[in-house]
């Protein structure tokens, strides 16, 4: 959160994947819980199924809404059309952007019929939410994603890619959900060093924290593409050992 303050008023915060901490953070005035199904900026930490199903149950028992942020995880990125579908739950409100527009700026929210009754005209608007060009692009994008069943490819290739990455030297842990992949190295390998080395070798990745890299490959990625990426990362790691 450094560099993004001051934080929005009215929120209480709790440790990720800690259901009891979330329950303890709620009061009689709490109206909703908002959560990312995968913490991408934190180093790719997927929520556990127990955590997500527990949140849904807790919200139901206390008449609270469950809001899920799918801006980064939505539209086939995680091996399902929406990441929450991996957990077998149904949220009350879902926010989405990024993958929805296929490169065009757009934002949208979806809500259950019951929740949407509380909306008035414009109350859920966004700058590019209803722009006709962005909406046309989003419609084409969604049709392409669904017709080509790219969620299944994301799941298959995410598993394949992660299995290959786990075999690389100095890899401490690989975390992924579909094609949202994080690799944590041991203390001898810096994430920024790997990022720069990969960029020199024409592979674009990003670094998070001291020893983590994050990759978000195209949804149409193939095994051959994954193999090339792994080879570049391995070559970069070996160059850093010298």
Predicted regions and their residues:
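Conserved N-terminal phosphate-binding loop of PLP-dependent enzymes in the Aspartate aminotransferase
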Residues: 1-242
């Amino acid at each position: 959160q450094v560099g993004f303050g001051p934080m929005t008023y009215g929120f209480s915060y709790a440790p990720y994947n800690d259901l009891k901490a979330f329950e303890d953070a709620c009061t009689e005035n709490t109206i909703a819980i908002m959560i990312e199904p995968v913490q991408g900026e934190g180093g790719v930490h997927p929520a556990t199924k127990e955590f997500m199903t527990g949140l849904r149950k807790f919200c139901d028992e206390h008449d609270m809404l469950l809001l899920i942020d799918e801006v980064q995880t939505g539209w086939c990125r995680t091996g399902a059309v929406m990441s929450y579908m991996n957990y077998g739950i149904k949220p009350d409100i879902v926010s989405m952007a990024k993958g929805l527009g296929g490169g065009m700026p757009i934002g949208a929210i979806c809500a259950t019929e019951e929740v949407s009754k509380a909306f008035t005209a414009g109350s859920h608007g966004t700058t590019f939410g209803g722009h006709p060009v962005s909406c046309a692009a989003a419609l084409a994008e969604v049709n392409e994603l669904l017709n080509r069943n790219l969620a299944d490819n994301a799941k298959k290739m995410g598993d394949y890619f992660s299995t290959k990455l786990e075999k690389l030297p100095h890899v401490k842990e690989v975390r992924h959900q579909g094609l949202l992949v994080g690799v944590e190295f041991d203390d001898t390998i810096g994430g920024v060093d790997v990022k720069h080395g990969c960029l020199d070798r024409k592979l674009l990745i990003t670094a998070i924290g001291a020893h983590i890299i994050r990759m978000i490959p195209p949804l149409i990625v193939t095994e051959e593409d994954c193999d090339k990426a792994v080879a570049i990362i391995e070559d970069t790691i070996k160059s850093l050992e010298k």
